[in-house]
Regions:
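Thiamine diphosphate
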Residues: 1-120
Length: 120
């Protein structure tokens, strides 16, 4: 599993990696993007090493970094089994509690991964 994140989701990505290893014995790596465009990592990194790629972002997943990674994968010769894009819900309120419910958290991300991957 390769987990890609940036900004505010960087710490969460590292936590997800630890939970996947400790609870499910699924190893992986984390890439923290320094910039979003152009991508600050090479897709060749994925070649023959990872079956699954998980992108985590605090913005909505539509038109986000996960979509950009997917587009780059489709244009390349690199193949992976599954890309899981995790992002915020598209509707934000004005209250802090609303923001907390909309931005990905550890439990939410692990639940999505469990639903999507057959290895967990």
């Amino acid at each position: 599993v390769l987990i890609v994140a940036y900004g505010g989701m960087s710490k969460l990505a590292l936590q997800v990696k630890e939970v996947l290893l400790s609870k499910f014995e699924v190893g992986g790596d984390v890439v923290i993007l320094k910039q979003l465009s152009p991508l600050s990592f090479s897709l060749d990194l994925l070649k023959d090493k990872y079956e699954y790629l998980i992108s985590i972002e605090e913005g909505i997943k539509e038109h986000g970094i996960g979509g950009e990674i997917l587009a780059n994968l489709l244009e390349s010769e690199v193949k992976i089994d599954s890309l899981i894009r995790i992002g915020a819900f598209g509707i934000f309120g004005t209250l802090a509690s609303s923001e907390e419910r909309n931005i990905p958290n550890l439990d939410w991300v692990i639940k999505i991964i469990q639903q999507r991957l057959d290895v967990i």
